[in-house]
């Protein structure tokens, strides 16, 4: 029982709770507010959280298949409560952020609907016999939501090799403090040529 509830807690935290913030950040990008690296970091973060949730869901479903007798109506109710609380906390966080000013073309109500849709999608992936936490929520999807669940084709800067952009960037006379100093290019050539 403890493993099931612990895995569920993490699925809710990583798979629902922070997605209201992701939605707000993605919405800002629609109006040229967080571009370039900021945009990529949000996409990588969402991809990372999706991978965590996929793994946690797999673990939970395996736990349930190996120990089917541990599911009881009481545990199902605890799981439903966790999902509902996660949506409630995500909405509360969005409301807190909106105290500083609302975002263009994104209301608190839209964030709440999105989080409820997400909770429904996440719980449907669990093998507990529940299709939706919020069965009456709208089926209309916000257009910007797809970015959060797209498989990223971007190269994560933590995974990519470094690129040296400094070649030829300095002009004029430059005196190196050490007469034996070699540039990166010179060192590479020395290593390659033996």
Which positions does each model-derived feature cover?
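Non-heme di-metal
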Residues: 1-194
């Amino acid at each position: 029982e403890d493993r099931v509830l612990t895995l569920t807690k993490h699925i809710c935290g990583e798979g629902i709770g922070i997605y209201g913030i992701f939605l707000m950040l993605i919405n800002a990008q629609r109006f040229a507010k967080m571009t370039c690296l900021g945009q990529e970091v949000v996409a990588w973060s969402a991809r990372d959280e999706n991978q965590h949730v996929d793994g946690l869901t797999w673990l939970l479903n395996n736990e349930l298949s190996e120990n089917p007798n541990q599911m009881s109506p009481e545990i199902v109710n605890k799981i439903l409560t966790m999902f509902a609380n996660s949506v409630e906390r995500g909405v509360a966080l969005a409301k807190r952020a909106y105290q500083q000013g609302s975002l263009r073309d994104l209301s608190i109500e839209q964030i709440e609907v999105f989080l409820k849709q997400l909770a429904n999608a996440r719980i449907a992936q669990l093998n507990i016999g529940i299709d939706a936490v919020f069965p009456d929520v709208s089926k209309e999807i916000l257009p910007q939501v797809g970015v959060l669940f797209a498989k990223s084709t971007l190269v994560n800067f933590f995974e990519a090799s470094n690129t040296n952009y400094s070649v030829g960037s300095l002009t004029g006379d430059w005196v190196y403090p050490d007469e034996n100093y070699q540039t990166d290019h010179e060192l590479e050539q020395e290593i390659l040529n033996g």
